């Protein structure tokens, strides 16, 4: 008999060779119906894989990320099986599960292309194969046999992948007449897949290398129920309406120019106003928390990034070094701000009394992204991080960590991100040798993060083995208005850079000590954060943040002068206002400015100009009646003051 321990600490004994499927059935028929994969001692297994020794077991359903992963991974194989039947001789690259669905990179063959118009036929074949409920079989075979198998099919991509694996056994999965190289896990059979939608076709270079062949990437998604697919497709349609690229163009926030270069956004006047207000908002909070603003160059000597380790990590993702013709020095576009901040810390000797030192910068950094990977503001080649680096004593780590968490909470509240969760990334429990820093420092840092989350009442998932080699971290994932998860806000403890840059302070014992470094970026990057904010709000920004708070609409040209007088009076009270004095009917002006998401519209005509009044319309609410100009101005000022006071109160308490 073997002992199976469950997540709640309870255990049962079973015959050796029991499977996750059998364990689920021993608990309840409903669980056996819903379970998709099994966690065995921290690894995700197929449900029908035998368990032959004592183990900790967790059963994963659709609501678990591991369950979805197995489901979508099997769906990728189902698509590959359909493609092999429809396109004889097709070659396969990789086909993973991703956050929302799956894809497969394929080479259809010389002169053959797969386009969006072909997706319905592929989808139909997948549905037919799923209906057969083909058993998915896992096999362990020798590496030589795997090379022979895929070599006989002339599948050079699989042969290349297998050649790079260590000698020994290779895992394959078979369903029907299709076999694929794969670690798994997978569903028991294809019948679990009830609803399928292939979404799009794109190009992708083999192994991400622009010098290699461009393959065809087919994206799809699948569900265990048709109703789930219908709901997802509705969500997808709403997401298209909220696409930050579409709204950014409509609101004239940002643009791209091929003459400037792909992945290099141009911030237009209205977008610049929005971004600067976000920056000012964070600067006010940082000032309260004792941060000092710094500015560093856009380039740095290559040796700086060799010292920091960023050249080794980001060298392939960086633009080529800039060579000075006379001195022969090499400079790089800055890939990260932290090495520069370390150099600022080193300029002045520090005592233990000086710490913590908090350096903040809206610093622009540059990474080379392949053109096919660029996407609006969320994936660019030049972006500005709301970066800060804190240098503190080990005994100050927890307190400083809590304060950074407070800053992130204030930002999320002010911008209406109500639903968020956190992940604590800690060391691998077993392989400790791959981490730098003393055991004592690591334990202190990990304990500080866990206790900080407990003190703040923040539920957090702990992931072992996810920490960087130089320290543990806390990541925040927010859910937007459509329920999509975005990673926003990171707090990272770092023992590496203080060592690399030989940072030190004089302790109370008059000896030299290493500071602990904290990296933090609540927004992450301004570009990506603005993209998420646009899609979360559908471009309807809070009144304190929106580029234009008011637009004045004269009903005819006769009242343009009065409209500009109203605008001038509001401008004098720091209310952001525009005048739409186009020679158009007022109904057209109202519709156009509704699309621009301007919160308030003031309509002025004969009566309003005579009485020194305005007719007020609020975005999404309609007519608010006639008001004196001063009354309306006071209404705006109070609404903004109430919003600002709410988040100021949070950090002043």
Swiss-Prot record:
Annotated stretches, region: Catalytic: 243-542
InterPro entries: aa-tRNA-synt_IIb, aa-tRNA-synth_II, aa-tRNA-synth_II/BPL/LPL, Anticodon-bd, Anticodon-bd_dom_sf, Beta-grasp_dom_sf, TGS, TGS-like
Cofactor: Zn(2+)
Domain TGS: 1-61
Gene: thrS
Organism of this sequence: Porphyromonas gingivalis (strain ATCC 33277 / DSM 20709 / CIP 103683 / JCM 12257 / NCTC 11834 / 2561)
Name this protein carries in UniProt: Threonine--tRNA ligase
GO MF annotations, alphabetized: ATP binding; metal ion binding; threonine-tRNA ligase activity; tRNA binding
EC number: 6.1.1.3
């Amino acid at each position: 008999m073997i002992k199976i321990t469950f997540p709640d600490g309870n255990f049962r004994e079973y015959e050796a060779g029991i499977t996750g499927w059998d364990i689920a059935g021993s608990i309840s028929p409903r669980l056996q119906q819903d379970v998709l994969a099994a966690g065995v001692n921290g690894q995700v297994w197929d449900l029908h894989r035998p368990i032959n020794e004592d183990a900790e077991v967790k059963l994963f359903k659709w609501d678990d990320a591991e369950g979805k992963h197995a489901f979508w991974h099997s769906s990728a194989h189902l698509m590959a099986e359909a493609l092999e039947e429809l396109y004889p001789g097709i070659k396969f690259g990789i086909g993973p599960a991703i956050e929302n669905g799956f894809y497969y990179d394929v080479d259809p063959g010389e002169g053959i292309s797969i386009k969006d118009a072909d997706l319905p036929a592929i989808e139909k074949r997948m549905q037919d194969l799923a209906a057969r409920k083909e058993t998915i079989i896992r096999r362990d075979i020798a590496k030589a046999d795997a090379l022979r198998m895929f070599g006989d099919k002339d599948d050079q991509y699989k042969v290349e992948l297998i050649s790079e694996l260590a000698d020994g056994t290779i895992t394959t999965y078979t369903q029907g007449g299709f076999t694929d190289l794969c670690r798994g896990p997978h569903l028991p059979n294809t019948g679990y897949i009830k609803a399928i939608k292939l979404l799009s076709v794109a190009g992708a270079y083999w192994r991400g290398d622009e010098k290699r062949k461009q393959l065809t990437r087919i994206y799809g998604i699948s569900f265990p129920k048709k109703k789930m697919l219908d709901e997802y497709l509705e969500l997808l349609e709403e997401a298209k309406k909220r696409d930050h690229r579409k709204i950014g163009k409509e609101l004239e926030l940002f643009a791209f120019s091929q003459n400037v270069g792909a992945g290099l956004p141009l911030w237009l006047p209205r977008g610049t106003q929005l971004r600067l207000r976000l920056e000012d908002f964070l600067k006010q909070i940082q000032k309260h928390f004792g941060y000092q603003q710094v500015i560093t160059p856009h380039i740095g000597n290559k040796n700086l990034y060799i010292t920091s380790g960023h050249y080794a990590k980001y060298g392939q993702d960086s633009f080529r070094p800039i060579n000075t013709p006379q001195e022969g020095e090499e400079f790089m576009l800055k890939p990260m701000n932290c090495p520069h901040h370390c150099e600022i810390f080193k300029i002045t000797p520090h005592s233990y009394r000086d710490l913590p030192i908090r350096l903040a910068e809206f610093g622009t950094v540059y990474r080379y992204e392949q053109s096919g990977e660029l996407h609006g503001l969320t994936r660019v080649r030049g972006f500005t991080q709301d970066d800060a680096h804190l240098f503190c004593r080990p005994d100050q780590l927890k307190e400083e960590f809590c304060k950074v968490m407070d800053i992130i909470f204030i930002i999320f509240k002010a911008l209406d991100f109500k639903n968020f969760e956190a992940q604590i990334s800690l060391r691998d429990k077993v392989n400790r040798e791959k981490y730098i820093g003393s055991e004592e420092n690591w334990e202190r840092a990990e304990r500080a993060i866990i206790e900080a989350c407990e003190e703040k009442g923040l539920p957090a998932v702990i992931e072992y083995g996810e920490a960087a080699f130089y320290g543990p971290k806390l990541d925040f994932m927010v859910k937007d208005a459509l329920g999509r998860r975005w990673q926003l806000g990171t707090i990272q403890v770092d023992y590496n850079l203080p060592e690399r840059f030989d940072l030190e302070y004089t302790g109370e014992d008059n000896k030299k000590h290493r500071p602990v470094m904290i990296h933090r970026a609540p927004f992450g990057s301004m570009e990506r954060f603005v993209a998420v904010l646009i899609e979360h709000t559908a471009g309807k920004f809070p009144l304190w943040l929106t580029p234009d708070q008011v637009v004045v609409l004269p009903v005819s040209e006769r009242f343009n002068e009065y409209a500009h007088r109203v605008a001038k009076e509001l401008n004098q009270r720091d209310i952001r206002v525009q005048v739409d004095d186009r020679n158009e009917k007022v109904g057209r002006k109202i519709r156009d400015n509704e699309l621009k998401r301007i919160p308030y519209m003031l309509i002025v005509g004969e009566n309003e100009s005579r009485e020194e009044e305005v007719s007020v319309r609020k975005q999404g609410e309609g007519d608010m009646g006639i008001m004196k100009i001063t009354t309306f101005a006071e209404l705006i000022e109070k609404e903004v003051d109430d919003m600002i006071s709410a988040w100021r109160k949070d950090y002043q308490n």
